[in-house]
């Protein structure tokens, strides 16, 4: 966004310089983006899903609650937000080639969607509580960011330590049918 007075980009809205994520919130749904590009901005859903397994959020029975209150009552709590900044957010840099063969770098700031953040936190909490020797299954639909959920899970599981300071896991083995 260009400041109409100074004709300069607004720092808070500038990629990699300002806000790390932008949320669009209604009383029913949340969407997010890490890069504002005017009419070309691409928002991803940041919803919990419904109890029936559908997209969106359940509408609360209490008329004094919002279907999106998990955003401020859960995700944006200081400890949770710091956890996202420390363990999830990632600048992905890809080498690309244009149609004339010129190479360029494409930068994408990766911020977890709600279901990714939620499943990784649940998995890490279960592993901390239950310890080694258990099997876990992360199941996401097509195009929902399984690779990122797997990477965040493996990274966080490999860095869990006991109260004595020893690593909880000697290794983290990921079985997948994907080629990375």
Regions found by a protein language model. Give the residues of each.
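ATP-dependent helicase/translocase motor core
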Residues: 1-176, 180
């Amino acid at each position: 966004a260009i400041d109409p007075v100074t004709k300069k980009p607004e720092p808070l809205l500038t990629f990699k310089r300002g806000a790390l994520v932008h949320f669009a919130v209604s009383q029913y749904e949340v969407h997010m983006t890490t890069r504002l590009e005017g009419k070309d901005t691409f928002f991803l859903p940041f919803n919990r899903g419904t109890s029936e397994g559908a997209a969106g959020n359940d509408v609360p029975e209490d008329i004094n609650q919002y279907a999106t209150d998990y955003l401020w009552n859960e995700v944006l709590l200081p400890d949770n937000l710091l956890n996202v900044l420390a363990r999830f957010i990632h600048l992905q840099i890809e080498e690309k080639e244009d149609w004339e063969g010129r190479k360029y770098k494409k930068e994408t700031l990766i911020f977890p969607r709600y279901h990714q953040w939620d499943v990784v936190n649940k998995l890490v909490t279960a592993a901390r509580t239950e310890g080694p020797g258990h099997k876990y299954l992360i199941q996401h639909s097509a195009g929902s960011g399984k690779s990122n959920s797997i990477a965040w899970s493996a990274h966080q599981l490999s860095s869990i330590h006991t109260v004595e300071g020893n690593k909880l896991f000697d290794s983290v083995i990921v079985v997948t049918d994907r080629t990375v």
